[in-house]
């Protein structure tokens, strides 16, 4: 499972590429903008339930504007609506972006559209989302062959490339070879972008798994963390990169890797205790180390944060049949 962190589009542009700042000092921090957007999204759900259409529209607009007002913002809020169990409202949020040019639409938006269409059994929208997502990913692939017009354009292209890799790897498309190629291309395009290098590391580790590519993945993940610290990246980015490095160590699976994974992932969970993904990675580490009681406790914490996680439920069930028990209360 991949760590999931959401940033405003403009803030991410500075974070990802080491570019000169383009954000006004008067804007909220990325964390504050994220929290404010979540509040508006929750208010929109309440307005929809009560039938207050005026409030529904204003809260959705505020949530989108709070993330930057672009297609990426709509994808972020659409994903929140999916997380809230409202695929119908996810569609409401993302529809206004459908007519934008391919390069202006992050593939994450089409990922949201495909997920919502699947939940709503809308086959036509599912086909449209997959087709348009592939077109967007190809446009991004071609754009990586050209020099960026400026720092902001380069940073946005990096962000969209990350989303394109996720889209190619998703259940909607399932093109692992294409995802690896795009990740390699992005790492070459943005040689000092921590998240670009980290994403390439994930592609090698999750999609290839060959010993040679796993070694490459470790090197890339280590470089990503080093660059982030040198560039003074915000804490949320550093935590994400440590999570990736720990996860990649676990996937390589040598004895020294398991110790490294344990150290990194325990640190990540201490710094970000509400991350279900990081807790899942730590649970997998305890499982690999044979510490089943600890693994069970951590899987239970994952389900507390993410109740519908079917993979975690299955792993927990298997461990309990092996005789493991929870090592403490779930908090």
Residue ranges, per PLM feature:
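Register position in tetratricopeptide repeats
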Residues: 49, 83-84, 115, 119, ...
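Helix-start (N-cap) detector for alpha-helical repeat units in TPR-like alpha-solenoids
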Residues: 30-33, 37, 71-72, 104-107, ...
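Residue-level recognition of tetratricopeptide repeat
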Residues: 45, 79, 115, 163-168, ...
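Alpha-helical adaptor scaffolds
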Residues: 202-209, 214, 222-270, 274
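Short coil turns that delineate tetratricopeptide repeat
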Residues: 68, 102-104, 138, 191, ...
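N-terminal leader/linker segments that initiate helical-solenoid repeat arrays
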Residues: 19-72, 76, 83-84, 92, ...
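Canonical tetratricopeptide repeat
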Residues: 76, 112, 160-161, 199, ...
């Amino acid at each position: 499972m991949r760590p999931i962190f959401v940033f405003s589009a403009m803030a991410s542009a500075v974070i990802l590429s080491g570019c000169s700042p383009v954000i006004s000092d008067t804007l909220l921090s990325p964390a504050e903008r994220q929290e404010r957007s979540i509040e508006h999204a929750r208010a929109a759900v309440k307005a929809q339930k009560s039938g207050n259409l005026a409030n529904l529209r204003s809260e959705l607009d505020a949530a989108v504007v709070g993330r930057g007002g672009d297609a990426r913002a709509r994808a972020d809020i659409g994903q929140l609506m999916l997380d809230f169990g409202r695929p119908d409202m996810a569609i409401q949020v993302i529809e206004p972006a459908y007519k934008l040019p391919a390069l202006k639409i992050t593939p994450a938006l089409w990922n949201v559209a495909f997920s919502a269409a699947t939940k709503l059994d809308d086959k036509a929208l599912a086909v449209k989302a997959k087709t348009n997502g592939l077109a967007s990913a190809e446009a991004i692939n071609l754009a990586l062959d050209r020099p960026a017009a400026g720092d902001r354009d380069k940073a946005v292209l990096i962000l969209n490339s990350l989303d394109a890799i996720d889209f190619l790897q998703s259940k909607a498309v399932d093109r692992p070879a294409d995802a690896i190629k795009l990740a390699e291309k992005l790492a070459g395009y943005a040689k000092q972008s921590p998240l670009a290098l980290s994403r390439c590391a994930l592609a090698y580790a999750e999609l290839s798994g060959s010993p040679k590519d796993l070694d490459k993945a470790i090197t890339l993940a280590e470089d990503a963390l080093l660059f982030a610290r040198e560039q003074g990246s915000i804490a949320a980015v550093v935590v994400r990169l440590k999570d990736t490095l720990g996860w990649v160590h676990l996937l390589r699976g040598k004895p020294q890797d398991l110790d490294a994974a344990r150290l990194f992932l325990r640190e990540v969970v201490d710094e970000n205790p509400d991350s279900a993904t990081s807790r899942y990675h730590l649970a997998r580490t305890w499982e690999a180390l044979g510490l089943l009681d600890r693994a069970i406790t951590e899987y239970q914490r994952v389900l507390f944060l993410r109740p519908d996680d079917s993979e975690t439920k299955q792993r927990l069930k298997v461990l309990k049949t092996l005789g493991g028990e929870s090592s403490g209360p779930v908090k």
